[in-house]
Regions:
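Electropositive, beta-rich accessory/interaction domains or terminal extensions
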Residues: 1-128, 134-135, 168-230
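Short hydrophobic beta/alpha edge segments that flank linear recognition/processing sites
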Residues: 163-167
Length: 230
């Protein structure tokens, strides 16, 4: 895809709500709705975009970006995706897939500048929303997770704005696709984890997970239960 065609397709936010799955009621803010017009982006993301858990959001996870190119795949395997934001993302993009961006890269959108911090680690709430228990694992194995960014320069952006991609300064440039593989799939790749830890701009949540993993010599006591819906 040419750089000229990369753009922001939609901006979405969500509030806390309850979704039902079998006999369970699950509180979540995973249901996002597209916003119209120009949207102000602060250091913590979109005002009014709620999070149920304290460890969701924060400077390293201010916004979730999801490439719209993945929607056709998910529809082909049976997911009913309608509006942008269906995969719980804040920014739905055309272009800049997980293979295109690396930890520490910058993206200029309108007057906003964000920096790529870490791959997304999907959880069971996506499974509950779509009634598909395997969905979080499928997202990890396909690599179609999206990625989380920190806000470097707050400002205003809107759907249709161009995405201007700038490489970061990391000596070892690790794509989100590779970072996601190391974090979410190949959990015994200690060498890969050490490489990822060498990138200063890596988000602190992932850094904490990988530091413990390396110290243990492999996956140890990690929260893989987040993937599974009872």
């Amino acid at each position: 895809m040419s750089t000229a065609s990369r753009h922001l397709l939609a901006i979405s936010s969500g509030q806390k709500s309850v979704i039902n799955h079998g006999s369970r009621s699950i509180e979540t803010a995973i249901v996002k709705q597209p916003l119209a017009g120009a949207v102000t982006i602060s250091p913590l993301g979109i005002e009014g975009d709620e999070h149920v858990y304290e460890h969701h959001g924060g400077p390293d996870m201010a916004l979730l970006i999801y490439p719209s190119e993945h929607y056709s795949y998910w529809r082909s395997v049976g997911l009913q995706l309608h509006d942008a934001g269906a995969m719980a993302e804040n920014f739905t993009t055309v272009g800049l897939l997980e293979t295109d961006v690396a930890i520490g890269d910058f993206i200029n959108i309108g007057s906003v500048v964000v920096q790529v911090a870490q791959p997304r680690s999907p959880c069971f709430k996506l499974a509950a929303r779509f009634g598909r228990k395997s969905l979080p694992v499928e997202m990890q194995t396909t690599g179609y997770t999206g990625y989380l960014v920190r806000v470097i320069e707050p400002g205003v952006c809107e759907a249709g704005d161009a995405l201007l991609h700038e490489s970061g300064t990391a000596v070892d440039r690790i794509s989100i696709a590779d970072a996601g593989r190391i974090l979410n799939v190949d959990r015994h790749d200690i060498e890969g984890a050490q490489r990822l830890l060498s990138v200063t701009e890596l988000g602190e949540t992932v850094r904490s997970t990988l530091t413990a993993r390396v110290a243990a010599g492999g996956q140890h006591g990690e929260d893989v239960d987040r993937l599974y819906l009872d």
